Amino acid sequence: EKVDNGFNYDWLGYPTRTGVGQTHSLNVMGGSEIWRFNASLSYDETVGVMKGSDRANFNGSLGITYQGEKLIVSENLSVGTNNNANSPYGDFSSFAAMNRYWEPQDEEGEPILTYTHPLRSETSYSDNPAYNALVGVWNKTRYTNMRSATQVRYNINESFYISGLLGLSRMFNQADAFAPPSHAQFAGK
């Protein structure tokens, strides 16, 4: 009936959107012959093409340098964070493989879990890739990375110097994912 009526569901448009991002940065430098500093901040937001997918990065750094006659000491500290949300719609290829005569929801607006092809057996079915997004899932990650580098250089004379570098780094990760009992991964269990 849908074929005869010219029905053509846009499965490719269902999980997608126009993604627009933004980037901002600020850099400040200053000092004197002996002391110098550099501070920077940046923010980068990327809105993914799949609905519900986005990334936000924030980075900041501070550098201080002392340059004496024989001694040079510099310290650089940087902190970066990343917040990431994956699309609840899953893979785009799942939507590209869908039959255009199927709809993601039934007449009452309820999500359809699986479809059977009218010319195939009852045991041959296709999962609705939109189903899991409609039942409320999320998958988010976040990390914070802190780095510190201290460099010391002592000029013994014009031809020789001694230098040392100490660097420390620490990363904190957090992940949060949720799928309700009605999620397709629990079907039949």
Protein language model annotation of sequence segments:
Residues 1-7, 48-53, 59-147, 163-189:
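Surface-exposed loop/interface segments of Gram-negative outer-membrane beta-barrel transport/assembly proteins
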Residues 1-51, 87-91, 131-139, 153-155:
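Residues embedded in well-ordered regular secondary structure
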Residues 23-25, 59-61, 147-149, 153:
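Membrane-embedded beta-strand positions in outer-membrane beta-barrel channels/transporters
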Residues 25, 159-164:
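Beta-sheet entry/capping signal
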Residues 31-32, 67-70, 154-160:
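Outer-membrane beta-barrel strand-turn architecture
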Residues 36, 41, 66-68, 77-79, ...:
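Generic alpha-helical hydrophobic packing signal
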